[in-house]
Amino acid sequence: VTNPQHDTRIDFIYLSEPEMIEAGVGDLAKCVETMEETLILLARGDYRMAGASGNSHGAQINFPDNPEHEGMPANGPDRRFMAMPAYIGGRFRTTGVKWYGSNVENRKRDLPRSIHLFILNDSDTGAPLAVMSANTLSAYRTGAVPGVGVKHLAVENAETVGIIGPGVMSRTIFSASLTQRPTIKNLKIKGRSAGSTERAAQWFREKFPEVNVEVVETEQEAIEGSDIIIGGTSTSPDGPSGFPYFKTEWLKPGALVLAPAAARFDDDFVTSDARLVVDFKGLYAEWFNENGPDVTYEQLLGIPGNRWWDMVQEGTLKESDLANIGDIADGLVQGRTNDEEIFFYSIGGMPVEDVSWATDLYENAVSKGIGTKLNLWDVPELS
């Protein structure tokens, strides 16, 4: 029986994509600050994600290559559905889940490859606080997490950035990098096709007229002389031979490589000279546990942190060779000590990042009266 003294009404707000923009989803300087807080909370342990260890990236639905049932989708590149739930503590103390479907064929319909929705919940009652259009939420937090690496690991006077794979992810990463290193004045771009690369270059020129933008023909040209290198190429069906290759000899002393996607490094350099940083070690450990030792990083995602965790299991790296960016930001682990060190920063992406940024945007929306209020119930029918 419902206690008449209790207010049982539950309302939540819906935020469309234009309303998310109005609420500040694209404020990358602020988003970098929020991601830094989030990564510190991760390193301190004030979070929960899915899975046995609380570190899972999420739960994924894949499809068979040749479905036996009419209407069932068939497997294809980036063809999946995924739910990514998490709780984040600190000043946030909220819980949420990002849910998305992905299909490269969407491009033919003038739609994004993946379409995202986010639900933010009260961590005490479980009641929904907000339902959000989440493509921009996901894109900007994805750019801001590498931005935390730029803040703590890039040389102070960084001037030149090289991009391999100038898609949406690389654009938001570059935008976030500029908030942390306004000294950047040169950008080199290497893409897969001339047409899409030139379109990307034009986007950068219009967005950042103060930056000199150059299209280059090879990965080597994009890497050589760059203070910051962004690898934004999705996993190749050709395996490692199709991944961007960051050859040791091409890397400028002091370079920072941001690797949120498939990338290939020289193992001997990784084990001897490079400084290795990850967004969170627990994520890569859980990926390894979920997929088993027979699924190598090449088959999984191609993200360098997966390869480094394989090497930890092989004994060619020690776990202590990997540093959490949150521990560096928290002052517990030494960051850059000189302008010669080369850093590799692997970013896998985690739902805690969506939850924290969504919480900030929800609070902005409420304070500004943005969004549509929807009612779940006044009094629950079943209680």
Map each language-model feature to its residues:
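Short acidic low-complexity segments
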Residues: V211-S226
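NAD(P)-binding Rossmann-fold cofactor-contacting core
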Residues: Q180-K207
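N-terminal ligand-binding/catalytic initiation module
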Residues: V1-A139, V145-G147, N157, V352-V355, ...
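Short glycine-/small-residue-rich Rossmann-like dinucleotide-binding loops
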Residues: T233-P237, A261-A262, K281
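Rossmann-fold NAD(P) dinucleotide-binding segment
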Residues: E224-G225, S236-L256
